[in-house]
């Protein structure tokens, strides 16, 4: 049997936790504009599985690619990197 390939990981900020055991994570990346050369911020949202419902809005989390869990969920929360400050 062959070894499993290294899974993709991303670090992003939780933008929504309204769903049961699911959070929406916004991952920001910087790309260079193909024509003008300027660095542009690009944000992509991922739905990620949060088994313990531990994530709050504003938390910085690490997510890892996994098998499809639903129509749109293919990521899971690995760890909370930084908790949000509640004011």
UniProtKB/Swiss-Prot annotation:
GO BP terms, alphabetized: translation
GO cellular component: cytosolic small ribosomal subunit
UniProt-recorded Gene Ontology molecular function terms: rRNA binding; structural constituent of ribosome
Keywords, in A-Z order: Ribonucleoprotein, Ribosomal protein, RNA-binding, rRNA-binding
InterPro entries, sorted: NA-bd_OB-fold (IPR012340), Ribosomal_uS17 (IPR000266), Ribosomal_uS17_bact/chlr (IPR019984), Ribosomal_uS17_CS (IPR019979)
Role noted for this protein: One of the primary rRNA binding proteins, it binds specifically to the 5'-end of 16S ribosomal RNA.
Quaternary structure annotation from Swiss-Prot or TrEMBL: Part of the 30S ribosomal subunit.
Similarity comment: family membership: Belongs to the universal ribosomal protein uS17 family.
Name of this chain's protein: Small ribosomal subunit protein uS17
Organism encoding this protein: Heliobacterium modesticaldum (strain ATCC 51547 / Ice1)
Lineage: Bacteria, Bacillati, Bacillota, Clostridia, Eubacteriales
């Amino acid at each position: 049997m062959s070894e499993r390939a290294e899974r993709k990981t991303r670090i992003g900020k939780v933008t929504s936790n309204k769903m049961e055991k699911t959070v929406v994570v916004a991952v920001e990346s910087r790309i260079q504009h193909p024509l003008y050369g300027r660095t542009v911020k690009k944000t992509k949202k991922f739905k990620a599985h949060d088994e313990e419902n531990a994530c709050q809005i504003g938390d910085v989390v690490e997510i890892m690619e996994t098998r499809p869990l639903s129509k749109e969920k293919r990521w899971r929360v690995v760890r909370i990197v930084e908790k949000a400050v509640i004011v």
